[in-house]
Amino acid sequence: MKIYVDADACPVKDVIIFEATKAEIPVTLVTSFSHYSNAEQPIGVETIYVDSGADAADYRIMQLAQKEDLIITQDYGLASLALAKGCIVLHHKGYKYTNDNIEQLLQTRYLSAMVRKSGKRTKGPKPFTAEDKEKFRALFKSFIVR
């Protein structure tokens, strides 16, 4: 198993790196050049930089990921593609994407886009909390400690 992180706006990178390093599982952070950092990463953690295009990180993750790899993303489109490839996909708020819930998530995203297109406003996501972070940590550990 390898871990791929859609890292541009991922608030749990520290949890992923800490827990995966402890379990000796390789992590690849995929992020745009606009988030470039000289920060040194622990052994087993690689950062791949991609162009700042809308889905560049998603495409790169899909090129790299194999069946049963673990993907962390908040992007429903990437989650859908990764599920179809046989990957395990987690959201940073601590839930697992499944074939049962992805259709509903994509439908909700589409309907919200249509509402915005008509000139109306929609609610954004709730703020990320410490409770969300711990929920993610527990779920993440359940997949890497086997």
From Swiss-Prot:
Pfam families: DUF188 (PF02639)
Family: Belongs to the UPF0178 family.
PANTHER family in the record: UPF0178 PROTEIN YAII (PTHR35146:SF1)
Name of this protein: UPF0178 protein BCQ_2874
